[in-house]
């Protein structure tokens, strides 16, 4: 097994001296390598006070211009080609080239913005002219009915104080105001119908939803002394408006300059657009002709402007992806360079970072190549620095192991060079899942879906618009594939196919030909080759047998899993050469676990191996045995094997001894070591000649940096917590593995109920009707199986398997005090 799989890769601290003139191309090359995790050497400097803030701000402003251009491209429905950088853009470009790109983008953005503003202005004027022409046309049609002038209206006004339309082209507010006893704004002395009046009108266009408000406000304000004519605007105005709303053309006729001024103000306050319309027919005809000429001219100019804008945006769309990538890459380089120190004396940047030791030759070769290409006067220096600082944790992963590693990293990052539980989870995670989900049919459905994702991973991986759930399943496609395959295997062992048994081999239970008993009992004539005998599925005591089998199987697998994880801690202790932890932590932990639950597993297997019927004995209860083992040592209800009580007393004593062993030995040994080291240090100081005070302070400071001060209280508290957690955890964690039995039972019963409620009813029917019902019920059964049993139950079993790894398994060895290796890379930027 590769060391980088079982343990994190060895990582070295490197120090880089980068000449300022070649820093950008060097950082570009390192970003392509994705192999150095840079440290922040300016933690106390705020972001806006760092060295390359001005460059980053300018690039950010340019990216903002690109976002604006991208939005305009999307608005115009122009396709942006896929992100394919030309060869000249593969690396960070020279400063002069970047400046040329920024200037070009700035110039294009200004040009596009000017064209957009001109287009919007022309569209507004074009729409306004359309509205004006529409108002003129409707007004001319209205006045044509009344003799082409307002004079008939004036004559009619002498006999009535209010006019309102009576057909579909007018909108009456009220019946004749004189009949209601109101005379508008006239006094009692001025209500004579024969008064001389001068009528005039206001024409315009308003959104239809606001016309009713305008009508009511005008009537109430003018007390009914007006005439309103309204008509629906043409559809061309509806589609040309930004909000795509219907509009109404209105004509308000009233008398008096002040009243007309008030009408104009009220109309404009409600969003109406007013247009001047001539009273005489020749004047209106001239206005219509002028409006049509303006519409034609504006349309021609607008088409030319749109064509120019489309041409510019098409050109930009061909290059915008490359520009975005180049600017984002250059911005990323400057952001990383802000982490470095600047040496003004040597005109160079000083960087520190973590690099996998195996990649150091590749990094050095890259630095030499870049230095040769840039003809830098000063060399680029890379030094490996020896330090006691803890490096980051780095695991090399591929598309298969990435999902499993992410599951473990979600709980915590492993300490540097600690055993990687992610490689163990490749087998244990889908296997524990399958114990709960085991069904050959359901596992086949799950494996088929995952296999489809695996076969089409290139096509699906290239898509960026995957649904959230689909994307999650695609990311964990190999996890789902293994879960399905393991479920098929466990389902084969359970002899479960959609809750139904499979008679692959003949049953090893036969019924007697003649029986004198009232209830016939089957006789076992052999052992079924593999898995559960199908006869058990139809037996009356099927549930009792399967519960007992799966419950004991859960305990066995749980103890094996915890024991294996405990041995992983031994691997850690040996690797880090912590002998004290081996005999003060691992050994008592192993004895405590195996003295209780390891012994229980052995008794379960032993009880299975004994033919109790042949011995004519009642098999003892293992649960009662385990309880009496601690509550009443040496007492047995039923003996399982000779010498049982003496062995159990010895195991109890061994388990009890392990508790103070875990609690006391490690703190005591550490305290003795620290006391001896202090005595040696004091003896050494007394034997040394007089030294300079500054040298002594430097020596003390150096020791403080290398080792943390010993605190006995912290060590004792930590060990007490660990002891209590482990001892109680052995009990609770073993019980927690019973979820394997519980979920397996629930899954099987739910599958059986679903079968009996759907397909079983269809199979009872015969003939054509039965065939039709079978097809219909199969659809219901298959959909419910996929949604409820595969998706929902599968998610539940996966979460339980996840918990068994995070808590029950990893608590036996996982320290999780590391931090992730996050190299400087352009890959995340590109995504």
From Swiss-Prot:
One annotated Gene Ontology cellular component of this protein: fungal-type vacuole membrane
Residue intervals passing through the bilayer: 419-437, 440-456, 472-501, 549-568, 587-607, 651-670, 724-748, 770-808
Biological process per Gene Ontology, one example term: vacuolar acidification
Subcellular location as annotated: Vacuole membrane
Keywords, comma-separated and alphabetical: Hydrogen ion transport, Ion transport, Membrane, Transmembrane, Transmembrane helix, Transport, Vacuole
Coiled coil segments of this chain: none
InterPro entries: V-ATPase_116kDa_su, V-type_ATPase_116kDa_su_euka
Superkingdom of this protein's organism: Eukaryota
GO molecular function: ATP binding; ATP hydrolysis activity; ATPase binding; proton-transporting ATPase activity, rotational mechanism
Topology of this chain in the membrane: Multi-pass membrane protein
Pfam families named in the record: V_ATPase_I
Vacuolar side: 438-439, 502-548, 608-650, 749-769
Cytoplasmic compartment spans: 1-418, 457-471, 569-586, 671-723, 809-831
Subunit structure: V-ATPase is a heteromultimeric enzyme composed of a peripheral catalytic V1 complex (components A to H) attached to an integral membrane V0 proton pore complex (components: a, c, c', c'', d, e, f and VOA1).
Function recorded in the entry: Subunit of the V0 complex of vacuolar(H+)-ATPase (V-ATPase), a multisubunit enzyme composed of a peripheral complex (V1) that hydrolyzes ATP and a membrane integral complex (V0) that translocates protons. V-ATPase is responsible for acidifying and maintaining the pH of intracellular compartments.
Family: Belongs to the V-ATPase 116 kDa subunit family.
Protein name: V-type proton ATPase subunit a
